[in-house]
């Protein structure tokens, strides 16, 4: 009887004791970003990464793209200040593409016509590369860490072998430089998540701005390549309704969102609302189920300096066409021959390309991260 009583008491103690679960390991990330601000996809995605409790943000490396690297660095530093994360280092990266120049682009457009609406730092009315301007409230007090972005990427990956995810939401110049300086980091990287390119084979700014860098990076044998193309991010759009939800939820970023999105009228010829390309990439790292459908593809970039310089090149090995009429005679298509025909060159590597987004889930993740 005493033994039963003892067992009963012990069981009650176990049931009443607080549950003890192993702490979930944080995702180690280096964010490589053309961090234009104080609004837009580049800046909001940085705020998400800086606020995410699931993320161990090891550093932010800046790059030219939507904005020159000098102002991009200013806004990346400011992002660390307004999120209370000045412990995260910001390292300035490359100012120019590996080969592509604004002058060459202008000449190409004279010959072939203009096929990209937005040129980023190559816009004809873009400021000078050295020009900066203060964020709301003035320039950040925190300074960029001395050194080169490529060196920081190399050193950080080698210090955390097999653990680091590269989040790449701008042109891939810094990543290409790091890989050329130390090819061994590719095998030591957990995975590379890239916002860029087009699943339909068209132009997109990040890869178009530095085609050679994008081609170099895509041809490396990373353990995992995840690409969020233009078409995926186009499914989620910032809106007054969404930003009102962020403000209503409260949190340290509510004032910033209210001021920048709900109280500040846009400049002439601009809008406060945009597609949320980079934010989607952040959300998919934190919760992969936000992507309802992905496809297996092999991607490259056209680096021939012709009419399609910078275009995405796509191989879809699973894309055997479905014939509605028996044009090949009374026999079914030869699946193996088609797959062999559609196979990419040997130097290409498989990527998981995001195709369909759970918009409702994405919006919940965005609001939670921005208000937590």
What annotation goes with each model-predicted range?
Residues 24-86, 123-241:
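Active-site histidine-anchored catalytic micro-motif
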Residues 25-27, 47-52, 56, 208, ...:
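Conformational coupling and interaction surfaces
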